[in-house]
Amino acid sequence: MLPTILLYIVIFLYGIVIGSFLNVLIYRIPNKENIVTTRSHCMNCGYQLRWYDLVPLFSYLALGGRCRKCKAHISVQYPVIEALNGVLYLLVFWKYGMSVDSLVYCLLFSTLLALSVIDFRTYEIPVGFNLFILALGLIHGAFHYTQSVSYTHLTLPTIR
């Protein structure tokens, strides 16, 4: 029982970490900002966030939803996306267990979550998200192709 609970805690933590990265994508992709090299910062004062300001969900709660430096409000989107992604990961792993399907569905749900928020805010869907979903689908389909192929429908009827 305890190892199962620990596994679900780890899965949730992994989900909120990915959710934190989704927030980076949600903000930076529509603004054409670099998602790799640009440091996270306060949108109000430009304060570069320290590692302890970036702990998903917990930093937001510890800071009361405000910037450490200027005390400006931080959008509630950040903890909501992180928590929602963590819960989605829990549900996927609860349904499919430790499998390739779980990994693929988690990546798919995370991508759709980020894509939905960007679309809601900008009325645009970045092409990169569609290409990622396409690649994910092709890889998943190729992985399961050998398990699901049935040639019985290709047999010719016999004449008697």
Language-model-detected regions and their locations in the chain:
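Feature marks short, highly hydrophobic, charge-poor N-terminal signal-anchor/signal peptide-like helices
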Residues: 1-8
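Short hydrophobic "helix-edge" motifs at membrane interfaces and signal-peptide entry regions
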Residues: 8-10, 109-110
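Membrane-proximal soluble regions of multi-pass membrane proteins
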Residues: 25-77
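Intramembrane alpha-helical segments
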Residues: 71-149
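Conserved small/polar residues in nucleotide/adenosyl-binding loops
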Residues: 152-158
